[in-house]
Amino acid sequence: MEHESKNKVDGMEMEKGKKESGSRKGLELTMRVLALVLTMVAATVLGVAKQTKVVPIKLIPTLPPLNVSTTAKASYLSAFVYNISANAIACGYTAISIVIVMISKGKRSKSLLMAVLIGDLMMVALLFSSTGAAGAIGLMGRHGNKHVMWKKVCGVFGKFCNQAAVSVAITLIASVVFMLLVVLDALKLP
């Protein structure tokens, strides 16, 4: 009798362990899909951000201003190109890691767990650094810099600046999702 109840308890514990493992895997898969969507959206929003405006330039105070058509594009600023590239790399990595998680079906070796953990950690570093770079340039565009005589450009290119700000915010959220994935990965290590 005692042996049977022990088996039942062990059986219940085993089923409970499977449920926790399945729900943890489901959480991981959901977070990876979320990271995939966030990085794809962030790269796309900033990649297509473009605005053209006619800007009056006054060359000589006595003459009327000269109207010049000016375009703001993400490809004109290296920090924005870096942000787009970082999001594209993270998106590609996430697609690969989703396939690995789905194929492994809970049978991941320690070396595979470590590889995914290191990959996730690299994405955290990459995305946080690109967020910082793009955010710094975005703030410079929004507020200018009086010390070096850089003028605000977001007053002219408001739509472009807003798209850049949205992309940077989405990248920051994706960075946090990857950071949470690192924590989940670390909890799986034996």
UniProtKB/Swiss-Prot annotation:
UniProt family annotation: Belongs to the Casparian strip membrane proteins (CASP) family.
Transmembrane segments: 29-49, 84-104, 112-132, 164-184
Organism listed in the record: Arabidopsis thaliana
Gene Ontology cellular-component terms listed: plasma membrane; plasmodesma
GO molecular function per UniProt: protein histidine kinase binding
Subcellular location(s) per record: Cell membrane
Subunit structure, interactors included: Homodimer and heterodimers.
Protein name: CASP-like protein 1E1
Annotated membrane topology: Multi-pass membrane protein
